[in-house]
Structure formats: structure tokens, C-alpha cells
Amino acid sequence: MTSMIDTIHEHSSGSFPCSTPVFVPHPTDNDATSHHAKPQGLLLIWDAPNLDMGLGAILGGRPTAAYRPRFDAIGRWLLDRSQQLSEQLETRIEPEATVFTNVAPGGADVVRPWVEALRNVGFAVFAKPKLDDDTDVDPDMLAHIRRRHSEGVLKGIIVASADGQNFRDELEQLATTGIPTTVLGFHEHASWAVASETLEFVDLEEIPGVFREPLPRISLDNLPEEGAWLQPFRPLSSLLPGRP
């Protein structure tokens, strides 16, 4: 399956302007004793391992440059959403863009260009060593959402993931408190969010400029006359014990 380092637009091409004003968590966020006031925020949680798997399933392999999501476009979309929320709430809302990912042993040099490109756009990256199959960033994403909520600064939440098992209950609870709650991803893999009466769903392809070309998406509703293969969502090996 493709790695998320292959799903970012070529960072050396100048597609990631340094001036994109996306809020990044203050370094003292890691200090429990910090008393710095934090802005009211619209939080984006990007579940890199999950979206990586989803994009690979749609493409049936590793993406070419045309099918790598452009995070500068995602950043601009997030800025627009925060402006809309600011107008609705009549208060200043700052976007906080975060990406959560694993780093395999010995893979730091491979992942580093991708991480640096994201940080250059204005995304904060939470990276965690992939020590075994059970080491993932799911609890860390939930912990960050809960932290911002407990701080009283969470005025909107966007989760880019199809992982309903991890996020659904949490997001629906937030939605019932009046916090605007959005799921961002691929509709083929997030039926739980598409069908939800409390959550908004936005397909990644609906965001202007995220992909250079339309994704080669095939479904039972738009089959070509000659027929088409529908790729599996997970490899057959996932049926084996201990395999993801």
C-alpha cells in the first residue's frame, strides 16, 4: 500500500507557500503548566494512515503526482471555513491544521521531506514511532480533540478520516453540544458519516485544487458499458490473524 509520503504534491515545486497563515500549536502546548491564552479555534485532524489506505484503494496502487492531495489547497479551504465560522459566531476563529502519522523504524529520512513540506505550509505534525502493528495514532488524535475541548477553545472540528470506529461517537457527542462537526474523506469509505444526521461530510474531491485530475473512482452507480473492476478496500492478507 502506498505511503502518505507519496500522497503529497511535490514539495520542491513551490506548491507550498511559506506565507499561508494557518495556526500552528504553540511549542508550549506540550507544557502542562503553560498559561498562554489560546485562540478560539477550528481544528483539523488529518488521519494520515487511514486516508493513505483509502486513496490507495481507490487508485489500486501508488498515486502519481496528479493524484496526490495538495495540502496548500487544503490549507486554503480550512482558512475559508474558519472565516465562515468567524462570521457565524461573530468572533475571531483561528484554524489549527494538524496531521497525525506513524514513522516506521529506519524510515525517518524517507518521511522527513514530507513532514517538512507540511510544516512549511502551516500544518503541525504529530509523528509517532511504528513499533508494532498495535502502535497507531488513534488515541493521540482523540486526546488532542479532547484537550482542545477541555480548554474551551474548540469552536469547530474537522476530522479527515474514514475511521468511524475511532471517531464516530466522539464527533457525534461534540455535535450534540452545538460544535460544528465535519468529516473529510472519500464517500466510498465513510458511509457512517455520509448517512449521519448530525455530522457534515465533505468529499476530498469537492475541495478546489486538491487533486490535479479527477480520481478514477468507479462505483455500482456509474459503471462504464464495458464493466469495471471494483478494487478491494483492504488486502486479502488482512484476514490473517495479526494482520491490519
Q: Where are these predicted regions, by residue range?
A:
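Domain-level signal for Mg2+-assisted phosphodiester chemistry and nucleotide/NA-binding surfaces
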Residues: T2-T135
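Nuclease catalytic cores that cleave nucleic-acid phosphodiester bonds
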Residues: G107-R243
